Amino acid sequence: MSDELTEARERVRRLEAVVEAGLMVNSTLDLAELAEHVVSIATRLIDAERGSLFLVDRKTGSLRSMVAQGLSTGPLTVEMGEGIVGAVAASGEAEILDDPYADSRFEPKVDHITGFQTRSLLTVPVRDREGMLIAVLQLLNHRSGRFSAADVEFLAELGIPFAIALTTADLHREIVTREQLRREVRLAAEIQRALQP
């Protein structure tokens, strides 16, 4: 009974976090702030040491880190299919690695640069409503055990508000760009009329 109660409490805690992230979607168009918040929630509730979120660049197809906790060297860029993040992006399937150094796809250069020791990884694709890959969320080093299927499920749910926010921000940016273009066209037409005899 005690284990069931503990599991139920954990599920409630995680659902509350998804709701919290969902509420934040309505309060900001700042994707960097939202990404930080989502990664922070994920690392806290899954009890991971660090987390990162890689956004898919729609022009190049590569992935660029929006959040990389503990990394001060600037954004990382990963090609589709490269490393664990790129492999998850290419396959669209979440992965749990209990010993990343034993996996030939793991790239230890970030560990070497930062002095951090990656012992385990949980990497999950984030999709929009149409099922298009928009980001990859990765957690490093579970503090109190191993990453689980329940953790994968939670990260997938937590990615939904971020996907909605990204879509909303893209639409907002598109509307602002169109409106700016309309103003410029109107201004050009007014200037042209003013210059005509």
Describe each model-derived feature in a short phrase.
Residues R129-M132, R146-D170:
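Amphipathic alpha-helical "output/dimerization" segments
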Residues V56, R64-M66, T73-K109, Q117-L122:
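Regulatory sensory and allosteric helical modules in signal-transduction proteins
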Residues R119-D128, A135:
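A short, aliphatic-rich beta-strand micro-motif
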Residues L71, V136-G145, L166:
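Short beta-strand-to-loop transition segments that serve as allosteric relay/switch motifs
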Residues M1-E33:
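Signal-transmission linkers at sensory-effector interfaces
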Residues A163-P197:
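Regulatory cytosolic signal-relay segments
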Residues V19, V25-M66, G74, E82, ...:
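Helix-loop-beta substructure at the N-terminus of cytosolic sensory domains
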Residues I41, D57-T60, R127-L133, H142:
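Flexible loop/coil segments at beta-strand boundaries within sensory signal-transduction domains
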